[in-house]
């Protein structure tokens, strides 16, 4: 696929606990994106500190790491045309109060501290996050049968 890119999406502990994993995956699949990798894990503090290293000096950093370490997460890599930008639109605003209905956060969240999902904010950060959470051999290449019906 020409100009395909990848993004990192993580369903946070509150999204897992609330049983929203299937709904979130469904939305990305129905949009036409291809799942490249997925794992269900209890993220270590070390991994989370690396993931959120850009926020390490912010006052909410310790609470963010604690929250993300409080339960299992679903880490995923999705691929498709403009998947980073489109994925962010699908997620909604970081603050659910600013998210439109029809977005994941607009439909399922109330507070910014429990916003159920993370998505890469740029192609560069997606590459960094994918490399942090996944080994190269965990990224699976395949062509979905609907591929030719989604892309020109």
From Swiss-Prot:
Requisite cofactors: Mg(2+)
EC annotation from Swiss-Prot or TrEMBL: 2.7.4.6, 2.7.13.3
Localization annotation: Cytoplasm; Cell projection, Lamellipodium; Cell projection, Ruffle; Nucleus
Signal peptide, first to last residue: none
GO BP field: CTP biosynthetic process; GTP biosynthetic process; integrin-mediated signaling pathway; negative regulation of apoptotic process; nucleoside triphosphate biosynthetic process; positive regulation of DNA-templated transcription; positive regulation of epithelial cell proliferation; positive regulation of keratinocyte differentiation
Keyword Transferase in record: yes
Principal subcellular localisation of the protein: cytoplasm
GO cellular component, one term: nucleus
Function: Major role in the synthesis of nucleoside triphosphates other than ATP. The ATP gamma phosphate is transferred to the NDP beta phosphate via a ping-pong mechanism, using a phosphorylated active-site intermediate. Negatively regulates Rho activity by interacting with AKAP13/LBC. Acts as a transcriptional activator of the MYC gene; binds DNA non-specifically. Binds to both single-stranded guanine- and cytosine-rich strands within the nuclease hypersensitive element (NHE) III(1) region of the MYC gene promoter. Does not bind to duplex NHE III(1).
Annotated protein name in UniProt: Nucleoside diphosphate kinase B
Organism, as annotated: Bos taurus (Bovine)
Top-level taxonomy: Eukaryota, Metazoa, Chordata, Craniata, Vertebrata
Gene: NME2
């Amino acid at each position: 696929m020409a100009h395909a890119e990848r993004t990192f999406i993580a369903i946070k502990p509150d999204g897992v606990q609330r049983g929203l994993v299937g709904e979130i995956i469904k939305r990305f699949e129905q949009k036409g994106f291809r799942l490249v990798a997925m794992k269900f894990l209890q993220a270590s503090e070390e991994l989370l500190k690396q993931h959120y290293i850009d926020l390490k000096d912010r006052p909410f950093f310790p609470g963010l790491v604690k929250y993300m370490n409080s339960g299992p997460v679903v880490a995923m890599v999705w691929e498709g045309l403009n998947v980073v930008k489109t994925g962010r639109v699908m997620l909604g605003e970081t603050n659910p109060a600013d998210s439109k209905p029809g977005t994941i956060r607009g439909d399922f969240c109330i507070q910014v501290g429990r916003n159920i999902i993370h998505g890469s904010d740029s192609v560069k950060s997606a590459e960094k996050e994918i490399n942090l959470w996944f080994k190269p051999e965990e990224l699976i290449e395949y062509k979905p049968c609907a591929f030719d019906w989604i892309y020109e």
